[in-house]
Design a protein with these regions (language model features):
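Gly/Ser/Thr-enriched, mixed-charge loops and adjacent short helices
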Residues: 20-151
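Generic beta-strand/beta-sheet core signal
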Residues: 7-11, 25-27, 94-98, 120-123, ...
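Short, high-confidence coil segments that cap the C-terminus of an alpha-helix
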Residues: 3-4, 154-156, 201-202
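Extended, hydrophobic alpha-helical segments in both membrane/secreted and soluble proteins
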Residues: 103-106, 117, 143-148, 152-171, ...
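Ferredoxin-reductase
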Residues: 1-30, 216
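Proline/glycine-rich low-complexity loops and linkers
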Residues: 43-44, 50-74, 175-226
Length: 226
């Protein structure tokens, strides 16, 4: 939308506190067609890492304010995401961002869509030390323990957990036996695909190479491309 040459994100992601991640996405002038918007991989990522290592410290690099423009895309994102959700049901959501950046925006979006949302209080504020989890990946065993406890306390229908930069998501729901079932990424993707297909989605489904082939079978069942 902004016609940028590239998008760059500096993030701890779901890694240990001492690590920083650096992600680069290609813009339309660098790559067109299917490659536009993709994340850089090897060998370009290694070349960027070498350039970073060779650069001086940040406080030694002169900056030009003339080439910097702050752009807030949150309103556009919320509008578009709310359109995709459509009508909500009577659902209470426990939400955790694992001490990352997704809490406020996630709660605003889900509340706007008509859901009741309660943040896990101990993990609601951004904290680069991730004090309540040793490894803030919501897909890891044990990472959702605090969130599940909060979900039980408020009687939530579902727990949704983001990793610290909010590009990874996990979900868990209570079972009839009183325990909680945490969905794998493949299970979540299959459920979302089936949900969209049942609602009359058109176009093609796609998944990564490391994902289950189940989404492809769902697409074939509904006559959709994959």
């Amino acid at each position: 939308k902004l016609k940028a040459d590239a998008g760059i994100m500096v993030t701890a992601s779901h890694n240990p506190p001492a690590d920083n991640g650096y992600k680069v996405y290609l813009g339309g002038r660098i790559a067109t067609g299917p490659a536009e918007g993709v994340q850089l991989i090897s060998p370009a990522d290694a070349e960027i890492a070498e350039a970073i290592a060779a650069a001086p410290h940040a406080d030694e690099i002169p900056l030009s304010a003339a080439n910097v423009e702050n752009v807030d895309t949150r309103a556009d994102y919320l509008d578009r995401a709310a359109q995709l959700v459509g009508e909500s049901s009577d659902v209470t959501i426990a939400l955790t961002a694992m001490h990352g950046v997704g809490a406020a925006l996630g709660k605003e979006l889900l509340t706007r869509c008509g859901f009741r949302v309660s943040l896990v209080p101990e993990q609601a504020q951004p904290d680069p030390d991730f004090p309540t989890v040793s490894f803030p990946n919501p897909e890891e065993p044990g990472a959702l323990d605090l969130g599940i406890r909060h979900a039980e306390e408020i009687g939530a229908d579902i727990l949704i957990a983001y990793d610290p930069d909010a590009d990874r998501c996990a979900a868990a729901v209570p079972t009839a036996s009183g325990s909680w079932h945490q969905f794998t990424g493949d299970e979540t993707g299959a459920l979302l695909g089936d949900y969209l297909a049942r609602r009359g989605a058109t176009g093609n489904f796609a998944n990564s190479l490391v994902s289950s082939r189940l989404l492809g079978r769902i697409a074939a069942h509904y006559g959709l491309g994959h």
